[in-house]
C-alpha cells in the first residue's frame, strides 16, 4: 500500500504528458488549416493589463508581470509554430519610468532575470533559433539590464530563423526624434565629404539638380535610421485588455496595420485571441495589400 501514492503520481504524470501531446497535435493540425490562408510576417503586441490582473486575482505586486511573462512565452511559441517570422513586444515604455521607484525597480529586476534566462539551453531562443533585438533608448536602463540585453543580442546575432524585437525604454516619439537626428548628422557628413571632393578637384561648377536633391533629407533617410528598420512593418498589432490606444508605440510603422483589442488582460491572453486576430487579418488581407501599394 505504501507504493500506491507513488504509482498514482506516476500515472498522473503519464496522463499529463498524454494530454499535452494530444493538445500539441490538435494545435498543429489547426495551424495547418489556418496556414491555408495568408499568414502575417510580423505581429506586434502591447502587453497591457499585468497590474490589473494582479489586483483582480489578489496577487502581490509584481506577480502580474510574472504571469504576463508566462503568457508571452506561450504566445511566442504559437507565433513561431505558425511560421510568423517577426514578433515585437512592448515591454517597457520610457513613460513607465515615471511610476513609483519601487515598482520600476521590481520590473527591472524581473526583466534582468528573464533576459538572462533567454541564454539558457532550454530557453525558447535556442528552441527556435531566435535572433533577439532590444529596441529603445538602452542608455536609460541600469548597467546590469543594459549589459544583459547587449549580451543576448551578441549571442543571438547569427540566428536567422525567426526574430524577436523587445521594445524596452522605448516610445515612438523618441525613436522618430533619434532617427531624424541621425539623418541630419549623416547628411551633414555626406555634404562635407562632397564639398571636400569638389575643392580637391578645383571644380567651380555648380552642383547638379541631383546633387542638390541629395543634400535634402528624404523619407528613406529617416526610415533607414529608425531602430525598427531591422523588421518589416507589422501586419497585426494586438493590444490586450480591450484598450484601443497605441500608447506611443510604433506610430511610424502602423499606418497600414490590422489592429486587434481583445478584452482579456495580458496574462489571460491565449491561442484563441491570436487565431481570431489572424482570421480577421486574412479576411481583410486583399484590402490591406491594396492600401500598401497606394502608399
Curated annotation (Swiss-Prot):
Its EC number is 2.5.1.-. Catalyzes cis-prenyl chain elongation to produce the polyprenyl backbone of dolichol, a glycosyl carrier-lipid required for the biosynthesis of several classes of glycoprotein. One of its GO terms (molecular function) is transferase activity, transferring alkyl or aryl (other than methyl) groups. CDD domains: Cis_IPPS. This is Dehydrodolichyl diphosphate synthase 6. It comes from the Eukaryota. Belongs to the UPP synthase family. It comes from Arabidopsis thaliana.
Amino acid at each position: 500500500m505504501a507504493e500506491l501514492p507513488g504509482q498514482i503520481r506516476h500515472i498522473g504524470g503519464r496522463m499529463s504528458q498524454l494530454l499535452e501531446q494530444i493538445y500539441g497535435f490538435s494545435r498543429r493540425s489547426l495551424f495547418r488549416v489556418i496556414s491555408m490562408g495568408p499568414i502575417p510576417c510580423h505581429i506586434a503586441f502591447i502587453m497591457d493589463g499585468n497590474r490589473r490582473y494582479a489586483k483582480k486575482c489578489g496577487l502581490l505586486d509584481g506577480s502580474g508581470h510574472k504571469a504576463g511573462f508566462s503568457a508571452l512565452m506561450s504566445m511566442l511559441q504559437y507565433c513561431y509554430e505558425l511560421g510568423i517570422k517577426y514578433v515585437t513586444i512592448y515591454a517597457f515604455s520610457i513613460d513607465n519610468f515615471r511610476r513609483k521607484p519601487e515598482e520600476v525597480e521590481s520590473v527591472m529586476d524581473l526583466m534582468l532575470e528573464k533576459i538572462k534566462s533567454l541564454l539558457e539551453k532550454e530557453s525558447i531562443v535556442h528552441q527556435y533559433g531566435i535572433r533577439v533585438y532590444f529596441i529603445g533608448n538602452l542608455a536609460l536602463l541600469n548597467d546590469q539590464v543594459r549589459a544583459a540585453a547587449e549580451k543576448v543580442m551578441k549571442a543571438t546575432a547569427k540566428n536567422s530563423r525567426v526574430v524577436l524585437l523587445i521594445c524596452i525604454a522605448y516610445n515612438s516619439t523618441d525613436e522618430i526624434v533619434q532617427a531624424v537626428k541621425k539623418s541630419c548628422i549623416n547628411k551633414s557628413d555626406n555634404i562635407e565629404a562632397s564639398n571636400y571632393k569638389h575643392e580637391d578637384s578645383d571644380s567651380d561648377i555648380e552642383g547638379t539638380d541631383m546633387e542638390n536633391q541629395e543634400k535634402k533629407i528624404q523619407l528613406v533617410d529617416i526610415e533607414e535610421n529608425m531602430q525598427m528598420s531591422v523588421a518589416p512593418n507589422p501586419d497585426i498589432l494586438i493590444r490586450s485588455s480591450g484598450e484601443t490606444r497605441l500608447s506611443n508605440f510604433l506610430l511610424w510603422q502602423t499606418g497600414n496595420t490590422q489592429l486587434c483589442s481583445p478584452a482579456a488582460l495580458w496574462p489571460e491572453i491565449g491561442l484563441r485571441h491570436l487565431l481570431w486576430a489572424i482570421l480577421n487579418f486574412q479576411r481583410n488581407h486583399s484590402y490591406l495589400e491594396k492600401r500598401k501599394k497606394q502608399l
